């Protein structure tokens, strides 16, 4: 296929940004420290590469360029993280006000804040483009990132629906540049809240079941959770694979993604070429999870 040599544009953030200072480390482009930040990549497309290794000049040549917009902003604004730029300032402030934490407390436990703000922004743009939460393809991606944002919100004490409030900050900031966000504002806020409520109905039972499975893994000294069991968690409780994997990795374990996908494909084939996938992990899962939770509460 088309290819060619490339060049990378790096920015020297200064010696003070070398996170390995005081060691025998020597700074260098594409080195191990954080002093040099890659901002830009240019690929000079001028050849066609064949399977046998031959290179033939292309009749038309061009430059394929990729620039990290958020990295450019972080350099211009003199901050050490994309999440400390004004691109995320509004949503971070809303999130911090909801938690009641100080700025220092937020920065000391920054990962949940970053995940929520990143995922809510992504979900807002997806919904504005007509991609609502679902169980297949891009709709599954929307569902997964919304539910993952909700789970990370719970890590900072946010257990009631809150994603729409963060999304409103996203719309307020980006809306003048992307008017489709303002146009789709009702759909964005509604879909986020409904998906968050749906997930809350199932996540407690699903994560409790997952914790039991992970405890069994530890007792058997096995580091990998069977993907089929992870699929059962999704089919029964609506717990996305990515969240099961997050929880497992937090405990030094992992989930077999290949086996998960095989179980998902097998289910699709058994249910008529995937026609039943629309309900998988959705309202049916919520219904059965509610019944199971009620039975567990009664000691049955």
Question: Model-flagged regions — what are they?
Answer:
Residues 1-300:
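A glycine- and charged-residue-rich anion-binding loop/surface
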């Amino acid at each position: 296929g088309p290819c060619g040599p490339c060049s990378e544009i790096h920015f020297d953030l200064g010696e003070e940004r070398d996170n390995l200072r005081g060691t025998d480390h020597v700074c260098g482009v594409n080195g191990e420290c954080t002093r040099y930040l890659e901002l830009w990549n240019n690929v000079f497309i001028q050849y066609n590469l064949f399977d046998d290794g031959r290179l033939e000049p292309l009749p038309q040549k061009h430059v394929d360029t990729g620039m990290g917009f958020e990295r450019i902003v972080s350099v211009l604004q003199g901050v050490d993280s994309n999440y400390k730029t004004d691109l995320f300032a509004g949503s971070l402030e809303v999130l911090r006000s909801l938690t009641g934490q100080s700025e220092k407390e937020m920065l000391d436990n920054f990962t949940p804040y970053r995940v929520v703000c990143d995922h809510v922004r992504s979900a807002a743009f997806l919904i504005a483009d007509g991609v609502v939460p679902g169980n297949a393809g891009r709709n599954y991606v929307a569902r997964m990132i919304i539910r993952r944002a909700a789970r990370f919100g719970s890590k900072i004490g946010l257990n009631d629906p809150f994603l729409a409030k963060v999304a409103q900050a996203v719309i307020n900031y980006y809306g003048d540049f992307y008017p489709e966000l303002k146009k789709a504002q009702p759909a964005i806020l509604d879909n986020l809240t409904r998906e968050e409520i749906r997930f809350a109905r199932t996540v407690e039972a699903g994560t409790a079941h997952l914790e039991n499975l992970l405890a069994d893994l530890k007792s058997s000294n096995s580091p990998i959770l069977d993907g089929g069991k992870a699929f059962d968690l999704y089919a029964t409780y609506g717990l996305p694979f990515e969240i099961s994997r997050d929880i497992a990795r937090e405990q030094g374990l992992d989930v077999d993604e290949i086996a998960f996908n095989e179980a998902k494909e097998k289910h699709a084939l058994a249910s008529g070429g995937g026609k039943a996938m629309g309900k998988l992990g959705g309202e049916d899962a919520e219904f059965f999870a509610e019944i199971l939770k009620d039975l567990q509460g009664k000691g049955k």
